[in-house]
Amino acid sequence: LEMASLGSKVLQIRAVEFAQKYEVPLRVLSSFEEGEGTLITTEYGADKTMEQALISGIAFNRDEAQLTINGVSDTPGVAYRILGPISDANIEVDMIIQNIAPDGKTTDFTFTVNRNDYQRGMEILQQTADKMGASEVSGDARIVKISLVGVGMRSHAGIASSMFETLANEGINIQMISTSEIKISVVIDEKYLE
């Protein structure tokens, strides 16, 4: 499910959701070569336990854009006041980062949206910034999200560390990080994708 939702384009996400919900095994086959492909089931082995972290795939999504609003007063409800108008415009938000400034009075808020919604999102965010007295609005439509997908990703610190080390060794700066039990995602400059 994570691979499909992250843009791997191997399976249609609704097919994966139904297979997961009703425990229907899925077999993924290559259209380029013969073979048995990959069988996706709910069983994890004879005892159905997951002892080790296992990377099952790497996915990327280049259809993302990043929006940032800086210098917003850090008060309860700030996330709603920023994302409410974005949601009202039917723009889906993916990754979110909120940083409190050292003065403890203001916050910076960054989030990602689909690249097709970038211009509209920037316009809405600028209107929101004007109402909230924010110091700056910025954006970047040249980003890509890279995700490692597998079992036990968050509970095995070595996986994230290895990913970050690999990117650092290649001189690639990480702009955003998101983790869950089954994925680690980073946002980087699009020029590093290939």
Language-model features, listed with the residues they occupy:
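C-terminal catalytic "cap/lid" subdomain
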Residues: L1-T179, K183-E194
